[in-house]
Amino acid sequence: MATPKSFRDNLAEILKTHDFRTVELEFRLGFQAPGEFITNINKHVWTTAKEKLGTPAQELVMVDKYIRSTPGESSRYVVFPDGQGYWEHKKKVAKETTTGGKYGVRSAFSLERRENGKPPVSFRMQRTKYRTTFVKGPWKIDFTRVESIPATDRDCESTYEIEVELYDMFYLFEKELDIIIQEGNKLVQSIVM
């Protein structure tokens, strides 16, 4: 039986066979629950960490209307306050979870594709995201308050998320993948220390 590929090896393979600009490499804080990784952070911890980072590079509100979402793929229409929007299709390729410390880290990478198009007539869930972004070198640090509104008669839910994403994808050509993955993990963990 073949040994499964490591997170790093999966990423290296995808970078060889796909346009690097379609790859999203991210690190999210959270905790491991039975069967799933929860990315909701304590509101006080989230607010305190956000205040430590100083002046943000960007603040924005966007609405995601999901028409399809499975554990491995999602399609959503993203709308900005000016009414402009686009379709985003995301295919999750690999993930790994590191526990220990105050919070665990979910490292993941996906293939993303964006396209113009009309908004959906119906959707299964809507998420309004209030995002504050900080930039640190090639990394983007997002603090996002998310209001999830299911299309069914369930309650609205607010969550507080912290994500570090490799923003400057050319960084992949400057350092070895192991170092980049380590850097992303360390950066996201340092935010709440």
From Swiss-Prot:
It comes from the Viruses. Its EC number is 3.6.1.74. Keywords: Hydrolase, mRNA capping, mRNA processing. InterPro entries: CYTH-like_dom_sf (IPR033469), mRNA_triPase_Cet1_sf (IPR037009). Its cofactor is Mn(2+). One of its GO terms (molecular function) is polynucleotide 5'-phosphatase activity. It catalyses: a 5'-end triphospho-ribonucleoside in mRNA + H2O = a 5'-end diphospho-ribonucleoside in mRNA + phosphate + H(+). Changing E26A: Complete loss of 5'RNA triphosphatase activity. Catalyzes the first stes of cap formation: by removing the gamma-phosphate from the 5'-triphosphate end of nascent mRNA to yield a diphosphate end. This is 5'RNA triphosphatase A449R. It comes from Paramecium bursaria Chlorella virus 1.
